[in-house]
């Protein structure tokens, strides 16, 4: 479950929120979209890179289909069809037009190939100028595992952290990966920024998550949030 206490921007219309990282990013994206749609808001979901295609009835291709979904109290997902059951970014002018009509916009801004954590490639993330908030997501399932087993863009991650591929991911290293301006905070600038530690679904992961939150706050002055989702809620 998520709410305004964890993410204050969910209480206000007008935000454009970009999500980066791995370990539940798409699940969180749709959870936030659903939360806002349930309040009667016009919510738009899209991507600046790629996103898994949702159920067909949520995928809108025209103004009329977007308005119909909003009238039914649902969020609308927009994007151009891509291989492997994905959507890619819609034409820039179309996306800007649809964003201008929405009360809240949620954008997936990079990919992680289903790894629980990642470092960005040179061209990542793709943050729109309109985006005012960025969430860097990582899955707590990565902690305690060698980077080479749990981290997408392994070479970049090792360079950023200064460790070999065999190094186990610790709360300190995960906090560094999320808080770094070459990692989770890349290109964030003056935007609001949150580190999201997902998969906090066991006592051990919750403990490690809290340790990571402490490092984020004390060493990097970064706000962090623990989240977890039931199996039925996951994208």
Feature-to-residue mapping (PLM):
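G-domain G4 guanine-recognition motif of GTPases
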Residues: 109, 139-140, 160-167, 177-180, ...
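General beta-strand structural signal in soluble alpha/beta enzymes
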Residues: 19, 43-47, 77-79, 105-109, ...
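Walker A (P-loop) phosphate-binding motif
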Residues: 2-39
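Phosphate-binding/switch loop-helix module in NTP-utilizing enzymes
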Residues: 82-119, 124
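A short, acidic, amphipathic alpha-helical segment used as a generic capping/interface helix at domain edges
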Residues: 166-187, 211
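N-terminal phosphate/diphosphate-binding loop that engages ATP/GTP or pyrophosphate donors
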Residues: 33-85
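Canonical P-loop GTPase G-domain recognition
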Residues: 209, 213-235
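Inter-motif core of Ras-like GTPase G domains
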Residues: 121-143
